[in-house]
């Protein structure tokens, strides 16, 4: 399945919530009515079946983290093999992706922008270039912006945006050095409360 590159508003309208795909802090503008699903039909959002609710939650999380369907299923399988709650394991794996960590540290204004930085070899992990967005960052790893990329306006702009965003506790960032430490795997209580990972577990358990 190809990665979606169309209007970000359309995805948020599909899920009925702002997925914050346009920037880390900027809400969707007034022209994007997330209460109405995309398309030319009426404004009513159809009532979903139990399966439909589970599917929409999976799609929402997949789109938030920018993960393709096959990748997402593989993450679920890995989460199911791990110790502890499968849903929590799944979210922790998604949070540990390098592109997500770059976003959380404020070097990219969106996960898509962070993914592009990684793909363009603008990011170092423990002083070594890594260009794989799905690379799993480990506690203690140092993630930094490569020297030649530090003057990019998009990186500086992202850091400015990040200063307006509530910081997360599992990363420690030196904005001046454009470097940060992935301190620990986040606990479920530290992750977004508007995600119901149990619905995803129920979906894949069928």
Swiss-Prot record:
GO cellular component, one term: small ribosomal subunit
Alphabetized UniProt keyword annotations: Ribonucleoprotein, Ribosomal protein, RNA-binding, rRNA-binding
GO biological process assignments: ribosomal small subunit biogenesis; translation
Pfam family of the protein (one): S4
Domain S4 RNA-binding: 96-156
GO molecular function annotation: rRNA binding; structural constituent of ribosome
Plastid as UniProt keyword: no
Top-level taxonomic group: Bacteria
Gene3D superfamilies the record matches: Ribosomal Protein S4 Delta 41, Chain A, domain 1, RNA-binding S4 domain
Task performed by this protein: One of the primary rRNA binding proteins, it binds directly to 16S rRNA where it nucleates assembly of the body of the 30S subunit. With S5 and S12 plays an important role in translational accuracy.
SUBUNIT field: Part of the 30S ribosomal subunit. Contacts protein S5. The interaction surface between S4 and S5 is involved in control of translational fidelity.
Family to which the UniProt record says this protein belongs: Belongs to the universal ribosomal protein uS4 family.
Record protein name field: Small ribosomal subunit protein uS4
Biological source species: Marinobacter nauticus (strain ATCC 700491 / DSM 11845 / VT8) (Marinobacter aquaeolei)
Protein's gene: rpsD
């Amino acid at each position: 399945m190809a990665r979606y590159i169309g209007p970000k508003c359309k995805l948020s309208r599909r899920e009925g919530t702002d997925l914050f795909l346009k920037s880390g802090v900027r809400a969707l503008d007034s022209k994007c009515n997330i209460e109405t699903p995309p398309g030319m039909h009426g404004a009513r959002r159809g009532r979903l079946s139990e399966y439909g609710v589970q599917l929409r939650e999976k799609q929402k999380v997949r789109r938030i983290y920018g993960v393709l369907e096959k990748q997402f299923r593989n993450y679920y399988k890995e989460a199911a093999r791990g110790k502890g709650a499968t849903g929590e394991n799944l979210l922790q794996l998604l949070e540990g992706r390098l592109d997500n960590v770059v976003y959380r540290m404020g070097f990219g204004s969106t996960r898509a922008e962070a993914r592009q930085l990684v793909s363009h070899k603008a990011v170092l992990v423990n002083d070594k270039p890594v260009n794989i967005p799905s690379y799993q960052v480990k506690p203690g790893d140092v993630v930094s912006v490569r020297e030649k990329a530090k003057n990019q306006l998009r990186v500086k702009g992202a850091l400015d945006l990040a200063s307006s965003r509530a910081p997360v506790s599992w990363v420690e960032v030196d904005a001046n050095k454009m470097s940060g430490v992935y301190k620990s795997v986040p606990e479920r209580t530290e992750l977004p409360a508007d995600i119901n990972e149990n619905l995803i577990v129920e979906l894949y358990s069928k």
